[in-house]
Amino acid sequence: RDRHNVFLWVAIIVALFTAPVRFTFLFGQINLLLMMLVTIDCCTSRRRWWTGMLVGLTISIKLTPMVFLLYFVCRRDWKSVGMTLGSFLVYNLFALLVMPSTTRLYWTKIIRDSERIGAYHYCRNQSINGALARFGLHDSSRSTVWFIVALIVGLLIAVIVWQLVKAQQYFAALMLNGIAANLCSPISWDHHWTWIVPVSYTHL
C-alpha cells in the first residue's frame, strides 16, 4: 500500500508538468474543475438521488460534457440521464432569470459563431478535426470527412466504454469517455486534454 501511495504522489507531481495541466493554469481555464465535478458525479459504487446534477452543471458551463451522457447510458442509469438533462434545463432557466439578455444572446447568436473559438488548423487543436484541417482539406470536404471519422471513432469508443462498464471498470470507462470527447470535438485545445492525466492512475 505504501508503494502504491508513492506511485500515486509521483503521478500527481508529474501531472502538474504535463501540457494540459500547465496550460489550464496558465490560461486560467476551468477544465480541471469540470473534470473533478464529472468524476465526483459519475464514479460511485452506488447511485445517489442527485447523480447527474453535477454533470448537468458542467454542461451548463460548457456544452462539451454532454458527451458523458454516454457513460450513464452504458450503465443503463436512465434516472441519472434524466437528472442530467433536467438539471441542465433548470440551471439555464435560472440563468435566464438572472441574466436574461446575456442568456438569450448566447443561445441565439454566440453558440452558432464557430469563429469565436479559433482556427481549426491551429497546431494546438488536438482533435481529429484539427488534424484534418492541417492536411489542408477544404472546409466542406473536411467537415464531411471529420463527421464520418468522428462517428466511427465515437462508436468504437462507445463499445469499449460499454464493455468497461459491464466489467465494472467505471473509472476507466469515464476516462475513456472524456478522451472521446476531446477526439471527436471540433476543437480540443491542448488544455482541454486534462482527461489523459487521470488515466495514469488506472495503471498504478
Question: At which residue positions do the language-model features occur?
Answer:
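Primarily membrane-embedded glycan-assembly and transfer machineries that use lipid-linked glycans
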Residues: 1-51, 75-197
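Transmembrane helices and adjacent periplasmic/lumenal helix-loop junctions
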Residues: 55-72, 185-192
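Conserved small/polar residues in nucleotide/adenosyl-binding loops
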Residues: 202-203
